[in-house]
Structure formats: C-alpha cells, structure tokens
C-alpha cells in the first residue's frame, strides 16, 4: 500500500518507477470457466490473471494489432487440428463472445463449447503475443488441459517471450515440458533438514 500510495507522487520518482514495474507483472491464475465467460462490450488491452477478459483482449488485438493477431491464428491452426479462425463477435444484447470456426463445420462454436485445451492454448498465445510484454510473467503448471505434444512448442514460445526483455517463471510437474527446457533454464527446490528450501540449478548439479 505504501508503494502504491507514494508512487503516485511525482517527487518519489524511484518509488513510482518501482510501482510501475510491479503493476506490469502478470501472475497467471488462469481459470477455464472464467475464460469461457462472455464480456460486456468494452475495452481491454491485456489479459487478466484469470483470463476472464479473453474475448475483449482478442477483439482489441484484432482491431489494433492485426498482424500479431494473425500470428496467433496461424499458431492455433498449426496446433489445434481443424481450427480455421477465431473471432470476437458482439451479440445483439451487447456482449462480446469468442467464436471458433472449425473447417469441418459450417457454423462456428462459441467458447463455451470448445475444448479446455483449445481455449487454454488460445489464451496463452494471446498472452505471449501481447504487443506490450510484461516485465515478469509467472505461469503455474501450463501443462494442465494441454496435450503433451504441444508442450515443447509452448516452451519455445515462452523462451521467445523472455528473449524480448521480460522474465518468465514457470512451475511444472510435466516431464514433457521439462524435456524442452535447457539445463541452464531449469531449477528445482530441495527441502533441507533445517526446514528451509534450497534452489538448485540443473546445470550446476554434478
């Protein structure tokens, strides 16, 4: 609270800078049911922690950064068989819904009826192709709801995100995800007899 309060005053420039840094962090608490929800027509530039504004952010990216949104669609088509397009559509009652077009069907499916893995992969791609990357991105167990074959490519996406200047912290229990991680990128926690935990880098382990 002190950082947030003092950071609003111009004379505390260092605190204000620190405040902006923290406010730019993204600690994911992604929830499938939240991401399935529709949104009132509005405006959102960045994906929320739970993903409940996924439709609004998709609409924003499509309208303001069409090239990036096209990259997301191309990645989706590569990783989710049958996905032809995704669009955020406004309904007659002023709601924004995501519609997924499968090439084998005439009519698109709204987000409520697509698989958990399809929705989660789309949300991750929207997050990772954000035109304004977060300085710190924290993801817990990205393997949940995703097919193991997708994890290596997802790991590469996280690595590319980090190479653009941000930091990425990921906790995982998936050997498939770990297989795509370089040794110098991998750490684990060891519990010590004194009750504390020790962080060990895989490349330093004999």
Annotate the PLM regions.
Residues 1, 97-101, 186-187:
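Short polybasic amphipathic segments
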Residues 74-129, 136-149:
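Conserved ABC ATPase signature
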Residues 128-131, 161:
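Hydrophobic helix-cap positions at the C-terminus of alpha-helices
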Residues 134-136, 167:
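Residue-level preference for the first positions of well-ordered beta-strands
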Residues 153-206:
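C-terminal lobe/lid and adjacent interdomain/linker elements of RecA-like ASCE P-loop ATPase modules
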